[in-house]
Amino acid sequence: MIKKICLAVALLIVMAVVPAKSQQVGSWSIYPVFSGNNNNSLVDTDNKVFYLADGWLYSYDKDNDESVFYTKMNGMSDTDISGIYYNYDKKFLLVAYSNSNIDIVRENGRVDNVPDLKSVILTVSKAINSVDFSGDYAYIATDFGYMVVDCNKCVVKESFNYGKAFKSIVVTDKNIFATFDKKIYVSSVGESHYELSSFKETNIKQEMKLLKIDNNSMLTTTGWFYYIKIGEDPTNLAMSVIEKSAPSNVSMSGSNMVASYKEKYIVVSPDGTSQTVAMPSEIDGSHLSTIDGKGLWNLDSKGLKEFSISDGSVTILHDTYRPNTSTVSEPYYLTYQNGTLYSMNSGRNYKGASNGKSVMLSSLKNGVWNKLNPIKVDIHNNSYKSLIEPYGMAIDPFDSEKIWFGSFFEGIYCIKNGKQIQKIDHLNSPMYLDFVVCVSDLKFDKEGNLWFSFYNFNKTTYAPLYILPKDKLYKENLTADDFISIDLGNFATTYGSQLCISKDGRYVLLGSNMWKSKLAIIDTNGTLTDISDDRVAIVATYNDQDGKNFDIGYIHSIKEENNKFWLGTNTGVGLINNIKAAFSGNVVVNRVKVPRNDGTNLADYLLDGVSVNDIAIDGANRKWFGSSTSGLYLTSSDGSEILEHFSTENSSLTSDEITSVACSTDDNRVFIGTKKGTFVYESDAAPSQDDYSDVYAYPNPVRPDYSGHITVAGLMDNSLVKITDSMGNLVYSGRSTGGMFVWNGLNSEGSRVNTGVYYVFASQNENDKSSGCVTKILVVK
């Protein structure tokens, strides 16, 4: 009993000093996305509301006020959802993916997979276009015909490959209706369907999306909104107009159907009668669903809510719920600064072409996402009259709420709390208007001056690089005279050019991002806003350390470390060790060599032939490389050893196309942007500290059911760490990676240590005794 009491006291002491940190080293997580702009589907059921937004599936538990975001990490089998379909009779949700995979989400939350269609090899597309249900069976229209899935057994019962795209399908007690060849066809349920000829033409010669009301009626939602009556002769359908426009969402409500429009909703009965209800001006009714016809669930840009309408007045039944998510589904820019992660999309797609997408901007701080999309901005040149195609992102080093970014059409914006506080374009700067005013990258130097690159369309009479001094950043009436122009001769840039400023402010590098990308290197001589003493070198061809040509098409990323510059290119990785040599015309772009360690002296170039989109440096100075097609790489600090290679095959990543990488400057998190969202990896390295005053371990206490790594954080760089038991016996030792040390909870013999308090000692070297015990770990076996 005394021993138990002592352990309990020790437990309380240890827990009292441990910061809130619980993610195990090596674990993955994903940040969900809800932009509010791409709401796809909404389905109200007895207990939950399912909704599909930005291609991500959510559910809201109406009884417990709990929200679930569905990913591969919590049971789903795939990503990139193309549609959701609810079986109101059997109470399950069928989830269709763009790769033809199928999941079934049961009422109790269990997820079952039906992989047959995804796995089968066909010479035609297997895309899923429509789903209807008959009992436990799902009738699925595909690009090759249709198939029937037994959703109880999770197998394909029948499959009919006609080489013909079925755009829609409805099954009644007697017939199967399908749309293909821009007509509606019908076949008896009991007939053999192995030949396409089993389907007969109906009198409707239009390709329509069909939705079943009951066995005797359907709706169509293509073009206009129609009601279709099924009579004794199923080839002779009676069609009548409900509304001369298509609804954005249709769902079942008892025996009726509810069709959503922005300004109204229409309730359609099985007999074809309909009732139109006007929406109050304060509610966007584009996505409505109601299982009982009483409370209306609504999904709009602000989130999910439930309300009722009586005599034109609205009663809120459930307040607006917005999931704690990012708004950025394709994070091309990730920046971590002052404890906050900033995320933004890009104005170009992943082949470099302009994509016309609106600005999406979010920040994450203390576990809470904030939507930072500017509410209203000045538009001068863009015929779309909206803020689209962003490029580059920089956070004011003296006010992290001020976010600067460039754009393809409109120059530069600075926003704070969603409001524009500065705009720079041809009207108040030396930049000129040639259809667009494109700024593709921008960075702050150590003094707080803003540097930005300008797409000069090969018109080299206009500078491709400018500085706005710190004291002019927020000037109300900027003029061209407030800017410093950097003359780079005949150096031309395009959108997507890359800008890098060394931490000490001595060197500035600008990649043109044109084919056979040139690199401008500027020596500021330490005087950032005085260009009179600058030296400029333009590198047009690249030679490596062996005198061989390094064939670079595009430079995608430039990162600096102690005046060494890492280049991520379309053909691999380059490293400029001696930047000063550029000014004598002898710059060398090293191709880092990775020894094969196979008994030979042979080595391979680091990521040779791999297109590298982004580079990040972690707390142990290790390098993270995000590639275009092969996932994420972690190397040693000098790049000579590949420590990890993460892909969709061996990690939680859902895409091998890595768009951006950022490392936390506070802990061990690595943020990875992909075409399918933002991931977080808990690495085994963290930034080091100046002393041992804030060392902690997690998990702490270590409970009997825990078998993962135990992490010690807050250490000085490359610390010698020793773990002993209460008697002073050495249990484990090693060196920290940056400021982090990982222990597997085992002793030197490979066995789990016994219950007790273990002491962590840390020092800078073997003979340094000054640090003593820096923290304690309680292990319960």
Where are these regions (language model features)?
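Bacterial N-terminal signal peptides that target proteins for export
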Residues: 1-7
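Bacterial N-terminal signal peptides
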Residues: 8-16
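Short, glycine-anchored, charge-dense loop/turn motifs used at functional sites
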Residues: 720-731, 758
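Carboxylate-rich, polar loop motifs that coordinate divalent cations or form catalytic acidic clusters
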Residues: 4, 21-695, 730
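Glycine-centered coil/turn sites that cap beta-strands in beta-rich domains
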Residues: 690-722, 740-743, 768-771
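Carboxylate-dense, calcium-coordinating segments in secreted/extracellular and ER-lumen proteins
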Residues: 531-535, 707-709, 755
